[in-house]
């Protein structure tokens, strides 16, 4: 526990992964998904649904090739949670 002057306690709150995903969904944030064992490609899109297995439904999804920066539109897709290594918010 951290302390802030004059005996005030500051408690750090742990953020559950499901809450962060839900925040991305609520804010319609555009996210970048790093893929498992595919370091040269990422998927970008807006989360419109997910489940307890971290399967994601992405809207306006694009396949992004990291070396060439080429983008391939995919539309609305369902990405299995097994393929996800990292989720990151990206600015448009």
From Swiss-Prot:
One of its GO terms (molecular function) is RNA binding. Its main location: cytoplasm. It comes from the Eukaryota. It is found in: Cytoplasm, Cytosol; Nucleus. InterPro entries: LSM_dom_sf, Sm, Sm_dom_euk/arc, snRNP-E. GO terms for biological process: mRNA splicing, via spliceosome; spliceosomal snRNP assembly. One of its GO terms (cellular component) is cytosol. Residues 18-92 form the Sm domain. It holds the Pfam family LSM. Keywords: Cytoplasm, mRNA processing, mRNA splicing, Nucleus, Ribonucleoprotein, RNA-binding, Spliceosome. Belongs to the snRNP Sm proteins family. Plays a role in pre-mRNA splicing as a core component of the spliceosomal U1, U2, U4 and U5 small nuclear ribonucleoproteins (snRNPs), the building blocks of the spliceosome. Component of both the pre-catalytic spliceosome B complex and activated spliceosome C complexes. As a component of the minor spliceosome, involved in the splicing of U12-type introns in pre-mRNAs. As part of the U7 snRNP it is involved in histone 3'-end processing. Core component of the spliceosomal U1, U2, U4 and U5 small nuclear ribonucleoproteins (snRNPs), the building blocks of the spliceosome. Most spliceosomal snRNPs contain a common set of Sm proteins, snrpb, snrpd1, snrpd2, snrpd3, snrpe, snrpf and snrpg that assemble in a heptameric protein ring on the Sm site of the small nuclear RNA to form the core snRNP. Component of the U1 snRNP. The U1 snRNP is composed of the U1 snRNA and the 7 core Sm proteins snrpb, snrpd1, snrpd2, snrpd3, snrpe, snrpf and snrpg, and at least three U1 snRNP-specific proteins snrnp70/u1-70k, snrpa/u1-a and snrpc/u1-c. This is Small nuclear ribonucleoprotein E. The gene is snrpe.
